[in-house]
């Protein structure tokens, strides 16, 4: 009896399971049928909304087409139609109508910010639809190869037309002073880059400006990242390093140099040095390279990197002799020798600087002071003192209205060389309190 009960229970469970399976299968069939019906409904709405001379429609009926929008969301999300290429083709074709409409509105009113945002949103959505349709079409075995090629080219063109406004938006937003807009700059730049580099839609796209477009997008992204508060260091660095092989390399090295200016001199110098090397043969960025050399030279001088400084200063002196900052190479190099108490070398460096840049009084002044220090170090021998006097007299001749450069020094030097009559001419400049 117990065995019979168990058999009856087993049969009951099997019957219940079969009933549930049948109910589930029936529900699935109903859902699939409903999804396919929705797909047909969307197609009918689309075809009855777009211009068609046969039915006397010269323009798109957007009031009618709008009724398809919630249905488009249904067919692109339903598990029964979301992998159907035709669902995404319809979504794309409908979006093209709105994209074209908003594009025309944007051209008619280019300063309208609300229309601009709608245009960019429409562009982004259209591009995503084109990519999705193209990817599903490639897997559809029912479509002939030649038809696939034709469709691919058609929707590739539409995708490009949608991508270009995203590049323009990335440029605009990356120059904003608003954090939310800077983030949009990154978003649209990355969408453009990913589309061109990774999507099947663009795998065979060729255009003479394509490489330039991608470089611009990367530059806009880097600029936005730099200005967004809290952007991780690695994102900023990597985004600019991607530009090292482009025509934006100068800006990239400059931006990274500035990024580390206050926080890490070693890293700043690293990018300055790399920038100097990268721009070595770039005539168009000669001034920027000279700026790199100037900053690196100053950093090395202030940081005590004497050997590094000398190499950089040599670049400045030999390659940028006409640059206003080159005189500093002589002044700093002379200062290094002066502080090392190599006064003769210091004097010669300062004199070389004075010969090339006579309008900079510091060169001759430091040469004179070096000569005086040499004299003091050698026991104040008269020939050495006379050399210092000669240089201070040159300063007086060149700067007669600036006695603070030479007056007191000549008074002391003449006194120390037992020339009281000459010293008397400069006594008025002597500060007895010193």
At which residue positions do the language-model features occur?
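Amphipathic alpha-helical repeat scaffolds of TPR domains
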Residues: 26-53, 81-106, 139-177, 184-195, ...
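Single-residue signature of alpha-solenoid repeat helices
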Residues: 68, 123-126, 185, 236, ...
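Bacterial Sec-dependent N-terminal signal peptides
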Residues: 1-27, 353-354, 434
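Residue-level detector of the short coil/turn that links helix A to helix B
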Residues: 63, 177-180, 229-231, 263-267, ...
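Canonical positions in the second alpha-helix
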Residues: 75, 133, 192, 242-243, ...
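Hydrophobic/aromatic packing residues within the alpha-helices of TPR/SEL1-like helical repeat arrays
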Residues: 65, 72, 127-130, 189, ...
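Intrinsically disordered, low-complexity segments enriched in Gly and acidic/Ser/Thr residues
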Residues: 305, 310-311, 317-402
